C-alpha cells in the first residue's frame, strides 16, 4: 500500500466530484430548454444532487467500516456512472412527457449526488488513516480541491 498514491487518488476523486457539480450547474439552462422544464423544475432537479449527497452520508457513513472504503468508492463510481448515463440518455419530450423527463433527470442527479457523498465518506477516513499524525494537515490539503 502506497499512502501517497492513495492520497493522490483521493484528491482526484474529490476533484471529479467537484466537476460533477460544476458541469451540472453549467448545463442547467440547456437541460431545462431541451426537456421542456420550468425554472422551478430544473432547480428541483439540481437540488437533488445535494439531497443525494446528504442521504448517502447519513445512510452509508455509519456502515463504512463494515463495508470497507474500497466498496464505498466502487459504489460511488457506480452511482456516478448510472447518474451520468441517465442524464445523457434521458428521453426528451415529445417522446415522453415532461413529467417523465423530470423524474429521470431528478433520479440521475440524485445518483450523482449520492456518488459525491460516497466519495466523501471514503476519502476522509482514508486520509486520516494514512496520516494519523498529520490528520488535519492532510484533510486540509484534500479539501483544497473542493470548489
Language model region names:
Residues 33-35, 40, 65-66, 97-98, ...:
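Membrane-helix boundary and inter-helical linker elements of multi-pass secondary transporters
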Residues 37-46, 101, 105, 139:
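Juxtamembrane helix-start elements in MFS-like secondary transporters
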Residues 18, 22, 101, 113-121:
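Small-residue-rich segments within alpha-helical transmembrane domains of MFS-like 12-TM solute carriers
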Residues 108-144:
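Cytoplasmic helix-loop-helix junction between adjacent transmembrane helices
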Residues 5-39, 124:
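Extracytoplasmic
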Residues 22, 50-58:
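Residue-level signature of mid-helix packing/kink "hotspots" within the transmembrane helices
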Residues 55-102:
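Conserved MFS/SLC helix-loop-helix module at the cytosolic interface between two early adjacent transmembrane helices
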Residues 29, 58-62, 125:
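Small-residue-mediated transmembrane helix hinge/kink sites in multi-pass secondary transporters
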Amino acid at each position: 500500500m502506497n499512502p501517497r498514491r492513495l492520497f493522490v487518488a483521493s484528491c482526484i476523486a474529490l476533484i471529479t466530484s467537484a466537476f460533477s457539480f460544476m458541469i451540472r450547474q453549467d448545463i442547467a439552462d440547456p437541460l431545462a430548454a431541451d426537456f421542456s422544464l420550468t425554472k422551478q423544475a430544473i432547480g428541483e432537479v439540481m437540488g437533488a444532487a445535494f439531497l443525494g449527497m446528504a442521504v448517502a452520508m447519513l445512510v452509508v457513513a455509519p456502515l463504512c467500516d463494515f463495508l470497507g472504503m474500497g466498496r464505498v468508492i466502487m459504489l460511488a463510481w457506480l452511482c456516478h456512472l448510472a447518474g451520468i448515463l441517465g442524464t445523457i440518455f434521458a428521453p426528451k419530450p415529445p417522446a415522453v412527457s415532461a413529467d417523465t423527463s423530470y423524474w429521470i433527470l431528478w433520479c440521475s442527479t440524485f445518483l450523482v449526488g449520492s456518488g459525491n457523498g460516497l466519495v466523501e465518506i471514503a476519502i476522509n477516513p482514508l486520509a486520516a488513516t494514512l496520516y494519523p499524525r498529520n490528520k488535519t494537515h492532510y484533510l486540509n490539503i484534500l479539501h483544497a480541491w473542493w470548489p
